[in-house]
Curated annotation (Swiss-Prot):
Gene Ontology biological process terms from the UniProt entry: mannitol catabolic process
Annotated NAD(+) binding sites: A3, L4, H5, F6, G7, A8, G9, N10, I11, G12, R13, G14
Record carries keyword Cytoplasm: no
Enzyme class: oxidoreductase
Species of the source: Escherichia coli O17:K52:H18 (strain UMN026 / ExPEC)
Gene Ontology cellular component terms for the protein in this record: cytosol
Pfam families: Mannitol_dh (PF01232), Mannitol_dh_C (PF08125)
Designated gene of the protein: mtlD
One term of GO molecular function: mannitol-1-phosphate 5-dehydrogenase activity
Phylogenetic classification of the source organism: Bacteria, Pseudomonadati, Pseudomonadota, Gammaproteobacteria, Enterobacterales
Entry-annotated residues carrying N6-acetyllysine: K269
Family designation: Belongs to the mannitol dehydrogenase family.
Listed name of the protein: Mannitol-1-phosphate 5-dehydrogenase
PROSITE patterns xref list: MANNITOL_DHGENASE
Amino acid sequence: MKALHFGAGNIGRGFIGKLLADAGIQLTFADVNQVVLDALNARHSYQVHVVGETEQVDTVSGVNAVSSIGDDVVDLIAQVDLVTTAVGPVVLERIAPAIAKGLVKRKEQGNESPLNIIACENMVRGTTQLKGHVMNALPEDAKAWVEEHVGFVDSAVDRIVPPSASATNDPLEVTVETFSEWIVDKTQFKGALPNIPGMELTDNLMAFVERKLFTLNTGHAITAYLGKLAGHQTIRDAILDEKIRAVVKGAMEESGAVLIKRYGFDADKHAAYIRKILGRFENPYLKDDVERVGRQPLRKLSAGDRLIKPLLGTLEYGLPHKNLIEGIAAAMHFRSEDDPQAQELAALIADKGPQAALAQISGLDANSEVVSEAVTAYKAMQ
């Protein structure tokens, strides 16, 4: 089996690329970073530090790399069995034209073996969005052929990969946590379902997408925002602060009650999932900066994201949300000189006041009880 993976950054190398290579798949990375491309093609291998209770170093070998903006990547799309991405939500639109060209070439060459494309991004149904961009870039006479022979498979991914602090200045070395989860929608594949260790198949993807968003992402963000307010540097420092831990755990339990109502998750298993996530935040090997995790507060306070979406669920089912409100209030206090969204948030609150600002960012009714609760909590933190 041959695969092409867009994005040779830390997540690409440390998570998806590693799983594919470990499964014995012939893997080529596509990227724009020439330093990384040259290093991969010189060595055809790299090291991954896997850190949890202990630390181990795995070597990923037998890999190649091409530029994601040249002809080589188009040629590969015409030949491979699987295309994956870890480029960030914004970049999906930029790689779509190359994918479209590759699919046209595949059609012209008469290659009708099934191709599956999986975007492994921190977003909901990212592959469906990528498909829209690819379809827009395709000529009309290729669209029906692509619909027949190419599967666009949505996925949910979860692994903490902090920015590398390699002591060796090796551009390929990467550190990842032990935990990883890659869940894919098995109803969207063309041809036989792949057997890749570490890839989990489901016919109910949205349940797992929301489980991750409402638990890992909600908890991570609230830990960062409360941690920043309390003067902590890292996620580990913050979660070891008992006051912060109580709110974070409480918020994940509140969002968990929504998941249990909505999807029928088992309450005991979900409690164990929450405990596992708290353990991940405590990982001493992950130097995960609260400022990095907290960045882009406007996006994180938007209606479909990790703070407001679970809150809306508690309103839908009439469930408690005191700790989620604390997290939202802390997010409104997030300030960072390096983050344009943090500066925009501060300006918005200074201009409109916290009530109108939160309503504008989140889509919540300015006169609603929850906005009033959040503003009260926000003022209590000043």
